[in-house]
């Protein structure tokens, strides 16, 4: 319970895309990004290096690459708009940078959903020293 309280307090100080990304993951993949993907494999969570360990970790690798292509705003804090139409997430708004961040998050959430069968608990809190291989290019 204490951990949940700490997480809640930390989230209060975070605005924009990271909170929205969590909400998209919950809406699309029906899982908590925080408790399922924040420390998974070599790429899910802060930073990322080495080779993705499985298809789920590869979703995070692609998401990191997508964020790396965002240049006109900070993808971790840019607040964007989206809607749901016929069961699909549609990114909106007039700001192309924020829309790009939304697309990165949308694609990752769909990837997580589509790869739920590949999720392997052995990659949760995967030791970083196991992520030393040369990464593939974005």
Swiss-Prot record:
What EC number is given for this enzyme?
3.1.1.4
Question: Can you list the GO cellular component terms from the UniProt entry?
Answer: extracellular region
- Check the record and name the InterPro entries matching this protein: PLipase_A2, PLipase_A2_Asp_AS, PLipase_A2_dom, PLipase_A2_dom_sf, PLipase_A2_His_AS
| Entry keyword Transmembrane | no
The protein's annotated catalytic reaction(s) are:
a 1,2-diacyl-sn-glycero-3-phosphocholine + H2O = a 1-acyl-sn-glycero-3-phosphocholine + a fatty acid + H(+)
Its domain of life?
Eukaryota
Which residues are listed for Ca(2+) binding in this entry?
A: 43, 45, 47, 64
**Cofactors per UniProt?**
Ca(2+)
pH relationship of activity = Optimum pH is 7.9.
Q: Name one GO biological process term.
A: phospholipid metabolic process
Principal localization? secreted
Could you tell me which SUPFAM superfamilies the record lists for this protein?
Phospholipase A2, PLA2
Signal peptide range equals: 1-16
Name the Pfam families for this protein. Phospholip_A2_1
Report the SS bond pairs: 42-131, 44-60, 59-111, 65-138, 66-104, 73-97, 91-102
- Identify its protein family: Belongs to the phospholipase A2 family. Group II subfamily. D49 sub-subfamily.
- By what name is this protein known? Acidic phospholipase A2 CoaPLA2
Organism source for this protein? Crotalus lutosus abyssus (Grand Canyon rattlesnake)
């Amino acid at each position: 319970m204490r951990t949940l309280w700490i997480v809640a307090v930390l989230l209060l100080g975070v605005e924009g895309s990271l909170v929205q990304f969590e909400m998209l993951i919950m809406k699309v993949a029906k899982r908590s990004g925080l408790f399922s993907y924040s420390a998974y494999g070599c790429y899910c969570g802060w930073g990322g290096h080495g080779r993705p360990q499985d298809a789920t970790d590869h979703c995070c690798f692609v998401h990191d690459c997508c964020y790396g292509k965002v240049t006109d705003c900070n993808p971790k804090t840019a607040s964007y708009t989206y809607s749901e139409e016929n069961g699909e997430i549609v990114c909106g708004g007039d700001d192309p940078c924020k829309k790009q961040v939304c697309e990165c998050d949308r694609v990752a959430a769909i990837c997580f959903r589509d790869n739920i069968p590949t999720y392997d608990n052995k990659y949760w809190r995967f030791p970083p020293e196991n992520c030393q291989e040369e990464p593939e290019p974005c």
